[in-house]
């Protein structure tokens, strides 16, 4: 049976900034796990979500079904003016994204700290546009 295998996904919200999350799946995102993965991330795909870092350090394989979930998530966030950033990609995952020309290079980061720093920068630029002072990282 496809789409019915459970997948472990760790989701954490940034305690200093509401609406910013890190999602860290474990294993593979494929035809056996994509439905469970999608179900687990669905609660944070809300209009109040400002940014998501998808940490793929523990993902060894992503199938077309898994890519579909990621593209849907990216599209939803983009429509809401939010961002989806990727970090800790294993070489085969990075190559997959390059082959399908799926992600702009500015959304791929070496690690979560680098992605988080980028989100801080983008958040401060938005705050400055609205006439407020910049926030400092916690």
List each language-model region with its residue ranges.
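Short, surface-exposed amphipathic charged segments that create phosphate/polyanion-binding patches used
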Residues: 119-127
């Amino acid at each position: 049976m496809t789409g019915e295998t459970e997948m472990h996904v760790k989701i954490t919200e940034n305690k200093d900034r509401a609406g910013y999350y890190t999602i860290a799946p474990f294993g593979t995102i494929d035809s056996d796990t994509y439905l469970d993965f999608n179900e687990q991330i669905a609660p944070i795909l809300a209009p109040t979500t400002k940014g998501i870092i998808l940490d793929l350090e523990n993902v060894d394989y992503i199938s077309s079904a898994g890519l579909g979930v990621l593209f849907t998530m990216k599209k939803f966030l983009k429509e809401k003016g939010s961002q989806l950033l990727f970090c800790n990609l294993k070489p085969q995952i990075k190559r997959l994204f390059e082959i399908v020309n799926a992600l702009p290079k500015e959304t791929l980061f070496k690690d979560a700290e680098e992605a988080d720093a980028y989100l801080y920068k983008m958040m401060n630029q938005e705050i400055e546009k609205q006439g407020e002072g910049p926030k400092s990282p916690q």
